[in-house]
Amino acid sequence: MSKHSFLNFGIQNNPSPQYTRLQDGNESILEERYLRSCALKLAQQGDYTKAIALLSHLIDHHPENAVDYNNRGLIYFQSGDKDKALCDYNKALDLNSKLASAYNNRANYYAASGQLVAALADYEQALDLNPHHVRAWINRSITLRDLGEYAEAIENLETALLFGQLKGHIWAERGRTYHLWGDWNCAIADYRRALAELPFLKNQGGFSYSLRLQIENWLNELLFFED
């Protein structure tokens, strides 16, 4: 499982016919929305090059669109090009200083780079702008846990649970926090809650599959010591 709640992408081979239409310069508002959707699907399927090309062309036509920079930054990050990701996040925030998702994404960059204090500052900014940003609550809790602030990390995860989203993920992270904090009974209970919530998937490349596998490993580690 990734250290923070990043997306996990697979592989895509087929180009979108809408890409050719955009290259011809005949885009409409509806088509632009469709192309952004295509870029997301391409990225989720692992075809980062085509996804980035779509967003880059949209940016060329609308350089004032902060969301496109933020989305392209996320795909750069997922593809391993973290320097370009940071540049795009910064540009997105220059264009729209109230874009909570860009603060969350930039915080993920800082966390992955070991800059935990900078990450916390950006997560807090994201949550100030959007208190319902569940991923920012989860990510902030992981960063606090990395800093040894277990009690506050638990509080953040309990806040995240109030919104009724990503419960399996939240229970997994709360279980891991209890685990590292030494409260093994609470950890085991949360790991079991997470496994009951997460779907069983045959796709071994999916995020839920890798998350289940990680939780099972953590749980088995604790059950081994109990025996």
Q: Where does each model-flagged region fall?
A:
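Terminal, low-structured helical/coil segments at or just beyond the last alpha-helical repeat
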Residues: S2-P17, I188-D227
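TPR-adjacent "capping" and linker segments in tetratricopeptide-repeat scaffold/adaptor proteins
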Residues: P17-Y34
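Conserved alpha-helical positions within TPR/SEL1-like repeat arrays
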Residues: R36-Q44, V67-Q78, C87, S101-A112, ...
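Conserved structural position within tetratricopeptide repeats
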Residues: H57-D60, K91-D94, E124-D128, E158-L162, ...
